[in-house]
């Protein structure tokens, strides 16, 4: 199936003129020694073939035997006798006479020739004989003939038998005792016995007779006039006909019976082909005597166009390492084209520069020389009728060949017509005789021999046209492109006017006098004729009609050749020139654009240099960094590395401190559980908190300040310090603090808590005395009324927000504001450290009397918590007295802050990603201690239960009656000191 598909593709390419008919010469490669495996494979192939043929032969034999057995069983007894060996029936052997038995035998006296004729007649009429008598007669005559032959062989030679044999051959013999006629020589025939010669002399043993003389004359005549015997004939297509056959017609007749043999026959008897070959038309030149007409022809003689498949050829001359490439066992079996039937030779292998002299090839000494014996004398119809069995279809006669497509050379109207010289015509005729109708090879050889200029090369169609209309069947016929009234084409030797030598006139140049050349062009193809322009007559156009009595045209051109031969410009000279200039300009523009793009691309590629990454620049348009920038970058990198190292060390310390803090907290919890629940704190103890009494005189539980307010204040102060360090504008009230971020690790909180406790322990005692002194100073009267010491006004959730620079809006007519708790005062001091703290948690407030503003110490929302106002005696931005003492070098002990408050403060700062310095923490603790001291000084004389505890500072109170509210809202001075002002005596 693969072979069939491959052959179909080859035929399709042939139809499209895409299959090359010129096969290159097979190159001889180096010798490949055969291995043991190669021999095994070859023997395997032959064994496979033998087994297949043997099986086929056995099947055929079994079939023939079966037919004969059935025929014998269906035959009559007489027919069975004829079918059996010896011609005797079943059991007839008993009737055969025994040799030596005295039986009655009938003598048959007939001559040898007559006996042969009788036997032939009887053998041919065996089926028509009736009765056993006739059959017995035939058998007896055959037996007698055999006996006579044996006796003749045993006895000496008899002259009479010699005469009878000569009679069988057909020679004339004189009668016994009869003289020769006219005494003429008998050409070797023997005279009668006892007859004298013509000259009357006796004939002896030592006398040379006339027969010897005549024989010598015959030998001399044969030597002098020896006829020329027929040799092998080479056909135009390269096939070599054996000398047995005179022409291809005899081969076709001789192998006809072989091709007509039915497929059921497994073998072919070549002996039966002898009579058929001898019955062919006798040739004028006899074959050599060595070729006997009775000898059957071999298959290679009957089929010279086929490759014989033989077995592996053994190496000759002990050349074991060279494979015989000429052997038939490795021949190609696929018949792709007729070129495989011949041995094509490329013109380049003939070396025309050395072997072509004056138009004659000197190739008589080369290995590729083959004498052309009558190749040009064979009629073309014989060559065309001869076809190989692999062709698949009978070749069509030449009359049915269609006119090929006319090639269109480039710029055909601008090209002058080619003229054929007598030398070129002679070379064309020689090539046509050498390569009959192979126009591709003819054109190639012609261009190699004659043409030296590439412009004047001939294509196959031009060669065919020149031969057909000058020397072929179309010599005396009008051309297809000539008008009916045009004269016949001029011969090749026609002389043009104005030239001294005979120059052939091109067929297309013959025109009608007085008519322009363009007017003589017929529109056979249906295209409009050109009315003007520099154009010449074109070649014949394919019409699809049969070319009568024409030679085979050249093969069609390939698609590439047709595209190359297509004219690029058409029209007048001016239009052609304009088109050419326009195309040249476009080509120039395209070249410029391509060159520009290529140069730009090359320049872009040159900028990219494969160097080390330390030498490359990520941003080509950015200037290189200065030394200062490089040093700064290195410093920042070192700072980051140091911070990372410090952070890792702090994490390790936090882990250790967390363990210690956890143990301390557990011990503190155990002590708190062991203390009685109603046991009050001792007021004289340094760490004891002031006791707050309720309305009924019972001590109230100590209320811790709002931890969230303290945390917000510390976070806002830290954010403000950071913004000031980064170059922010100081005192901008619109800057809001950063939000507090939750989620800091507990290790950081524990570390900050321990640091706060250590610093608070150093300032435990000093703030107690400082608070008492400030309490005494705050009771001094001022401006004709009882003035309170500097206090921090804390507004209720309804109080209007304000900045620390403004006075408190909640103050009464006398400027006295309600005093908050110490925890609230500490929060107000923390808010004073930064102007941004005052903007936190501003809630709208109507003008509510101060006695109705209830401080909320338990909320943690920044909107509900109230901002703390600065004392009136301290300017904005100024430090507290404690801070002034510190600046003067006085060591002030601070009161211990609540552990939970400090821990919450540090946790809030750590959650916001801020690191609090010891100075900030120390200042915060001092402010908290100062507020606690102020709270304790205000609780010096809480008053009596009858007067109420509404003036107790730092305690949550609620209005219970309108009279009490009025008393609180408008305090008035009295000449008598009393508990109305909230001061005890």
Curated annotation (Swiss-Prot):
SUPFAM superfamilies membership: Homeodomain-like (SSF46689)
GO biological process, one term: chromatin organization
Domain of life according to the entry: Eukaryota
Biased composition, class Acidic residues, residue ranges: 169-198
Domain HSA positions: 24-100
GO CC annotation terms, alphabetical: NuA4 histone acetyltransferase complex; nucleus
Coiled-coil segments: 591-664
Biased composition (Basic and acidic residues): 143-161, 218-230, 558-573
Subcellular location: Nucleus
GO MF: chromatin binding
Keyword terms: Activator, Chromatin regulator, Coiled coil, DNA damage, DNA repair, Nucleus, Transcription, Transcription regulation
Keyword field contains Cell membrane: no
Biased segments, Low complexity type: 275-290, 492-507, 773-782
Functional description taken from the UniProt entry: Component of the NuA4 histone acetyltransferase complex which is involved in transcriptional activation of selected genes principally by acetylation of nucleosomal histone H4 and H2A. The NuA4 complex is also involved in DNA repair.
Subunit structure as annotated in this protein's UniProt entry: Component of the NuA4 histone acetyltransferase complex.
Name of the molecule in the record: Chromatin modification-related protein EAF1
Annotated organism of origin: Cryptococcus neoformans var. neoformans serotype D (strain B-3501A)
């Amino acid at each position: 199936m693969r072979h069939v598909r491959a052959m179909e593709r080859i035929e399709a390419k042939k139809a499209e003129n895409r299959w090359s008919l010129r096969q290159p010469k097979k190159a001889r490669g180096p010798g490949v020694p055969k291995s043991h495996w190669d021999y095994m494979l070859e023997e395997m192939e032959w064994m496979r073939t033998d087994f297949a043929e043997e099986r086929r032969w056995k099947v055929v034999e079994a079939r023939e035997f079966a037919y004969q057995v059935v025929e014998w069983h269906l035959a009559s007894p007489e027919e069975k006798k004829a079918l059996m060996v010896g011609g005797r029936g079943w059991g007839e052997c008993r009737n055969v006479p025994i040799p030596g038995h005295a039986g009655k035998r009938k003598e048959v006296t007939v001559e040898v020739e007559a006996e042969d004729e009788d036997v032939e007649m009887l053998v041919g009429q065996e089926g028509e004989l009736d009765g056993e008598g006739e059959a017995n007669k035939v058998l007896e005559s055959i037996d007698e003939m055999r006996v006579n032959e044996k006796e003749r062989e045993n006895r000496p030679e008899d002259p009479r038998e010699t005469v009878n044999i000569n009679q069988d051959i057909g020679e004339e013999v004189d009668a016994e005792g009869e003289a020769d006629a006219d005494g003429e020589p008998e050409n070797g025939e023997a005279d009668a016995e006892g007859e004298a010669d013509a000259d009357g002399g006796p004939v002896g043993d030592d006398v040379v007779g006339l027969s010897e003389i005549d024989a010598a004359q015959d030998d001399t005549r044969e030597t002098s006039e020896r006829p020329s015997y027929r040799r092998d004939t080479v056909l135009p297509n390269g096939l070599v006909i054996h000398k047995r056959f005179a022409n291809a017609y005899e081969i076709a007749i001789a192998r006809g019976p072989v091709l007509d043999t039915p497929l059921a026959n497994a073998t072919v008897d070549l002996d039966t082909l002898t009579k058929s070959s001898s019955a062919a038309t006798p040739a004028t030149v006899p074959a050599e005597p060595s070729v006997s007409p009775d000898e059957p022809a071999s298959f290679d003689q009957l089929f010279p166009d086929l490759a014989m498949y033989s077995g592996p050829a053994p190496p000759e001359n002990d050349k074991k390492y060279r494979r015989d490439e000429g052997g038939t066992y490795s021949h190609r079996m696929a018949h792709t084209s007729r070129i495989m039937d011949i041995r094509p030779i490329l013109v380049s292998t003939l070396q025309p520069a050395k072997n072509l002299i004056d138009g004659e090839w000197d190739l008589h000494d080369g290995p590729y020389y083959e004498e052309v014996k009558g190749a040009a004398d064979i009629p073309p119809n014989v060559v065309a009728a001869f076809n190989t069995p692999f062709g698949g279809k009978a070749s069509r006669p030449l009359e049915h060949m269609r006119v090929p497509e006319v090639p269109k050379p480039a710029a055909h109207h601008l090209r002058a017509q080619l003229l054929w010289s007598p030398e070129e015509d002679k070379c064309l005729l020689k090539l046509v005789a050498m390569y009959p109708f192979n126009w591709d090879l003819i054109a190639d050889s012609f261009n190699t021999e004659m043409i030296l200029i590439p412009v004047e090369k001939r294509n196959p169609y031009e060669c065919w046209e020149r031969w057909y209309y000058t020397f072929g069947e179309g010599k005396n016929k009008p051309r297809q492109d000539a008008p009916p009234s045009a004269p016949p084409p001029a011969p090749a030797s026609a002389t043009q006017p104005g030239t001294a030598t005979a120059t052939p006139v091109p067929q297309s140049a013959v025109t009608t006098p007085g008519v322009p050349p363009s007017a003589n062009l017929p529109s056979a193809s249906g295209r409009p004729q050109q009315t003007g322009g520099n154009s010449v007559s074109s070649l014949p156009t394919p019409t699809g009609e049969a070319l009568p009595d024409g030679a085979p045209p050249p093969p069609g051109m390939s698609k590439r050749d047709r595209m190359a031969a297509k004219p690029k410009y058409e029209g007048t000279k001016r239009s052609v020139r304009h088109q050419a200039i326009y195309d040249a300009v476009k080509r120039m523009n395209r070249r410029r654009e391509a060159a520009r793009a290529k140069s730009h691309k090359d320049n872009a590629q040159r900028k990219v240099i494969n160097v080390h990454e330390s030498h490359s620049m990520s941003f080509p348009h950015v200037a290189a960094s200065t030394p200062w920038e490089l040093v700064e970058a290195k410093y920042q990198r070192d700072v980051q590395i140091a911070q990372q190292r410090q952070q890792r060390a702090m994490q390790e310390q936090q882990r250790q401190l967390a363990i210690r803090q956890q143990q301390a907290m557990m011990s503190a919890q155990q002590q708190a559980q062991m203390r009685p629940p109603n046991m009050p704190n001792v007021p004289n103890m340094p760490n004891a908190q002031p006791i707050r009494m309720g309305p009924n005189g019972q001590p109230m539980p100590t209320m811790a300040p709002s931890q969230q307010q303290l945390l917000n204040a510390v976070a806002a102060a830290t954010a403000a310090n950071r913004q000031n360090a980064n170059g922010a504008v100081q005192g901008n009230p619109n800057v809001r603090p950063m939000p507090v971020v939750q989620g800091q690790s507990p290790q950081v909180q524990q570390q900050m808590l321990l640091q706060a406790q250590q610093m608070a322990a150093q300032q435990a005692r000093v703030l107690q005395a400082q608070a008492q002194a400030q309490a005494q100073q705050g009771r001094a009267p001022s401006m004709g009324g009882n003035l309170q010491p500097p206090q921090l006004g804390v507004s209720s959730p309804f109080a209007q927000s304000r900045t620390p620079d403004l006075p408190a809006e909640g103050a009464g007519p006398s400027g006295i504001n309600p005093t908050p708790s110490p925890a609230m005062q500490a929060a107000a001091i923390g808010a004073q450290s930064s102007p941004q703290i005052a903007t936190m948690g501003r809630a709208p407030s109507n003008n509510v009397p101060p006695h109705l503003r209830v401080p909320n110490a338990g909320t943690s929302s920044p909107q509900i918590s109230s901002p703390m106002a600065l004392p009136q005696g301290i300017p904005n931005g100024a430090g507290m007295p404690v801070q002034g003492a510190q600046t003067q070098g006085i060591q002030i002990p601070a009161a211990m802050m609540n552990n939970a408050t400090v821990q919450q403060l540090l946790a809030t700062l750590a959650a916001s990603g801020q690191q609090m310095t010891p100075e900030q923490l120390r200042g915060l603790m001092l402010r908290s201690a100062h507020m606690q001291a102020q709270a304790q000084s205000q609780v010096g004389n809480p008053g009596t239960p009858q007067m109420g505890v509404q003036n107790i500072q730092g305690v949550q109170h609620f209005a219970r009656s309108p009279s009490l509210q009025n008393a609180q809202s408008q305090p008035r001075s009295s000449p008598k000191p009393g508990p109305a002002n909230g001061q005890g005596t």
